[in-house]
């Protein structure tokens, strides 16, 4: 049980230490500089609202991004984002220690590359070092962030968090956003959303591991895969997984992105197509890399793509774009 007390969490000292974390990489941002121009007044005003429980989350500004795929991002005001960081900082370690090992999204010492390596490890074990057929059930949850049910999330949180005032605070953040349906959806862009969706999906992870007793399962956000040498077994657990997602979490699978394939014929997972002896970057990603590296790309763009391309069979693409290993 998370036992930290609300009054300690919202202390001025804690707000100040959280602000220092929040500032990293943001000092030159206009909205941050405006907040900092009256820093003491803003911090004390926020603290007063939190103490009196009169705090109301502000509005969001929305914009679209298209890399790696089209997404609608919602950005909160600085004071609200500071509070997101505070909540995240307090809750992260409590929940992270309870998550399953093979949940890889938005966690320290996890990430895409660890998930890719784990997928390869699982495939090697199931296929007995590529000497028998390995089947992969690959699934994608439909409209993941925009389908998170607020009431269900609160029920899950109440099983872990004792302090009712902490529930109130988290509730202010959760209820600050909804899709076309009131009480549904978390915004892409909130730091808290990254943690809350992992808490939400931990219910599914535990169902898969403890109830279904699936051995070779891994998940990255809304993408997950199960590996087995028995296709019929995968077909059977898919039905049970869909039912749990629908009835317990009010989520559904993306019908166009659910399939069972053999490892030998190539499995598309986390941007790469996986084969027994190599993995190839997805064709759409390849075109995007070439397009984004034309002209004079930013150094951070070059560095990001160089890191990406080191994790698969990309010699021709690296030669074409000039991204040879350092």
Give the location of each predicted region.
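Beta-rich nucleic-acid/ligand-interaction surfaces
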Residues: 106-115, 225-226, 260-264
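Reverse-transcriptase-like RNA-dependent polymerase core
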Residues: 11-15, 46-69, 82, 89, ...
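Non-catalytic, polymerase-adjacent accessory regions of viral genome-replication enzymes
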Residues: 1-44
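Short, conserved non-catalytic motifs in the polymerase core
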Residues: 25-33, 58-84, 98-111, 176-198
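Active-site-proximal segment of RNA-dependent polymerases
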Residues: 2-5, 90-146
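Conserved polymerase palm-domain catalytic core
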Residues: 42, 49-50, 120-221, 225-241, ...
């Amino acid at each position: 049980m998370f036992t930290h007390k609300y009054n300690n969490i919202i202390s001025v000292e804690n707000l100040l230490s959280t602000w220092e974390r929040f500032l990293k990489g943001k000092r030159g941002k206009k909205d941050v500089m405006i907040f900092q121009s009256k820093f003491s007044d803003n911090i004390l005003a926020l603290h007063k609202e939190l103490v009196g429980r009169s705090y109301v989350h502000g509005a969001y500004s929305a914009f679209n991004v298209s890399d790696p795929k089209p997404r609608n991002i919602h950005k909160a005001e600085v004071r609200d984002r500071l509070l997101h960081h505070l909540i995240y900082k307090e809750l992260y370690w409590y929940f992270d220690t309870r998550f399953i090992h093979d949940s890889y999204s938005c966690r320290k010492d996890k990430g895409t590359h660890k998930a890719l390596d784990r997928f390869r490890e699982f495939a090697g074990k199931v296929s007995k070092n590529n000497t028998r057929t390995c089947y992969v059930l690959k699934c994608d949850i439909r409209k993941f962030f925009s389908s998170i049910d607020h009431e269900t999330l609160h029920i899950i949180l109440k099983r872990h968090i004792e302090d009712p005032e902490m529930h109130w605070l988290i509730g202010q953040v959760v209820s600050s956003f909804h899709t076309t349906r009131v009480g549904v959806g978390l915004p892409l862009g909130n730091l808290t959303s990254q943690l809350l969706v992992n808490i939400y999906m931990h219910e599914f992870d535990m169902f898969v591991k403890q109830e279904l007793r699936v051995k070779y399962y891994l998940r990255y956000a809304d993408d997950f895969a199960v590996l087995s040498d028995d296709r019929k077994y995968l077909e059977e657990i898919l039905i049970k997984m869909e039912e749990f997602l629908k009835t317990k979490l009010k989520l559904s699978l993306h019908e166009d992105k659910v399939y069972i394939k053999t490892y030998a014929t190539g499995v598309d997972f986390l941007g790469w197509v996986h084969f027994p002896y190599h993995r190839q970057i997805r064709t759409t990603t390849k075109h995007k890399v070439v397009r984004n590296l034309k002209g004079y790309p930013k150094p951070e763009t070059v560095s990001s793509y160089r890191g990406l391309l080191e994790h698969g069979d990309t010699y021709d693409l690296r030669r074409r774009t000039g991204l040879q290993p350092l």
